Amino acid sequence: MLVEYLFMAHPEDGADTISHWKMDIDGTEITDARAGFGSYRDTYFRYAFTIQCNAATESIANGQLAGWTTAKTINITARSYSTSYDQDVHATRYWDGTSATHFHRPSLFLTALS
């Protein structure tokens, strides 16, 4: 299954950003899904990871499930590298000739792969 999370972000202080993103299934982190993003201006990001649902051996840290027959909770979380690189997520900083911040709705796509 392909998990894709698309979102807008911009530097909180107007300079640049560094952020770290991770995903977990039922509270266990998929360490192979760790990612970092950075930008200097409004940027549209794509955080994505493919979960293998028919693995011979289950290893959530590697994104491998032996099967998927019950409900599962997938969490995507993020943090700034430090307060010097804060990121305002789900927003634009610049719009129509001004620097007013506007909300931008994120998108989540779950695609079954065969």
Language-model region placement:
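Extracellular jelly-roll beta-sandwich "head" domains, especially the C-terminal globular C1q domain
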Residues: 1-114
